[in-house]
């Protein structure tokens, strides 16, 4: 996110949505927090199983990427070589399956 090339934005979104759906806000008990951290680590491990890492610069290692704040021009070529859509699909699929198997108590 923000071209810092740290945790993949798709993974960050997956973790934030899991927090919204399964978190208890400010009233996390120690046990709740432990369970939530397990959930996030499970989702991260499943993403890593498909792509080897959740780190953006490692996911994009075949591309010449920088961490400057100026975005690249969004050209047809940019979208042809950019693998980010694949990572968004993976994260969405993992979260969809997790939600289906573990319906949140809203």
Walk through the language-model features, giving the residues of each.
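A short glycine-/small-residue-rich loop at the edge of a beta-strand within enzyme catalytic domains
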Residues: 2-5, 31-34, 38, 82
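Phosphate-handling active-site elements
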Residues: 20-39, 103
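Small-residue-enriched, tightly packed secondary-structure blocks
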Residues: 1-22
């Amino acid at each position: 996110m923000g071209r810092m090339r740290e945790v993949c934005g798709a993974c960050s979104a997956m973790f934030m949505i899991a927090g919204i759906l399964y978190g208890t806000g400010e009233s996390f008990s120690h046990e709740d927090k432990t369970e939530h951290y397990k959930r996030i680590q499970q989702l991260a491990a499943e993403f890593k199983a498909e792509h080897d890492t959740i780190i953006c610069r490692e996911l994009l290692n075949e591309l010449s990427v920088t961490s400057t704040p100026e975005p690249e021009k969004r050209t047809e070529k940019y979208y042809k070589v950019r693998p980010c859509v694949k990572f968004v699909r993976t994260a969405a699929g993992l979260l969809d399956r997790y939600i289906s198997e573990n319906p949140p108590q809203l």
